[in-house]
Amino acid sequence: MAINTQDSTCLPLQEKIVHNNKTARAVELVILAFLVSMLIYRVVSFKDQEHSLPWFLALLCELWFTFIWILTVCIKWNQCSTKTYPDRLLKRLNEFEFPTIDIFVTTADPILEPCIITMNTILSLLAVDYPADKLALYLSDDACSPLIYYSLVETTMFAKLWVPFCKKYNIQVRAPFRYFTSKSSRFKDVSLEFQHEWKTMKNEYDDLYNKIEVASQRPFTFTCDHNSDFADFCDVNRSDHLAIIKVISESTGLPHVIYISREKNSQHHHHYKAGAMNVLTRVSGVMTNAPLMLNVDCDMYANNPQVFLHAMCIVFGHKNDQDWGFFEFPQAFYDGLKDDPFGNQLDNLYYVENGIAALQGPFYGGSNCFHRRKVIYGLSPNDKIKNGSIGNEDLHKVFGNSHEMRESAAQILSGSNAKIENQKSLSSLIEAAIHVAGCTYDYGTDWGKKVNVY
């Protein structure tokens, strides 16, 4: 007897699942019938009314209500979601075939956005199940705070212990502040080796937490020594300072970690997060130039270690890369109240996004989003640029006067970046990165107009 089996190479990496909502559709059709009947009655009975003006106003209101209702039904009519299969991805592709990804984490105030929360977000991203040499993490500090820089340095040192621990024991929650307070971290049917390493890791994290807390309460810890690592932060005004870029980790078994504080000048508008994202795009283009970019808010940790593999299912699951420009993961909130009485868990938003996904695609929510760099650079799905056909004059007008920026943009737009490996160390590219992080770099270019995230 023959056994019917399916080759894993033939199975889809991702598929769109249409939700069954026949009952909801039937209800909507009944409501539509009532609305149409009411409008017909208003129109037919209009001449027989003594109070024609109120009747006419009521008709206008009901027409407007019906119009809004129809728009709402268009979203509710088709509901779909995307299901991905990372296990099939791992069987089909080798790790060296995965694309490189630049990760952007943005923060603007160490008081309003506590450093320990930002560092937990970073740790969860450094520990994802993805080849470390394919990742580069950029932290944008719009406060130009030595506290944030100090926290990032200490966190990177802790990550050298935390990341191997997570991967060795397949830890599912890789933000330490959530892991060590969750029931999943409790000892139950585990080895003595795990218990010992767990306690060691807990002590190391507590030490990191205490260092950051002490530093945040005692700013004088950062002495203004021009020979120290904090020399660039001496006498800095957060709203008026030169760009600071530091490579904290490079080729150490972890993803690259780069600290960025873009140049600010009181005479030039910095455009808040939009400006920070454009600087991150330029600096990463000069330094690592990954074809994919992920932007994450500082308080949005990765709650699934395979999140990048799920993302790659969408990347490789489409026959044509022109089918998508960006995709994002929904935001979820921990420690919410049961049944969400205040509606702050955004459950309704998920429902709306499922409906929009069935029409064309979700709107950009501002975080947890993977972007194709060439799309951010202004290349529309129908544009085809052959290698060598991009004029240097055009690149100068669009991307600015940085030779390194123009060269990296040409690689991305021509599609040749996947074949060209950057042989330079990141430290040797800091000068070029500082240049593109200037507050006036985008003047006279398409940055913020045709070339931008926001």
Positions of PLM-derived features:
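Glycosyltransferases that elongate glycans
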Residues: 1-454
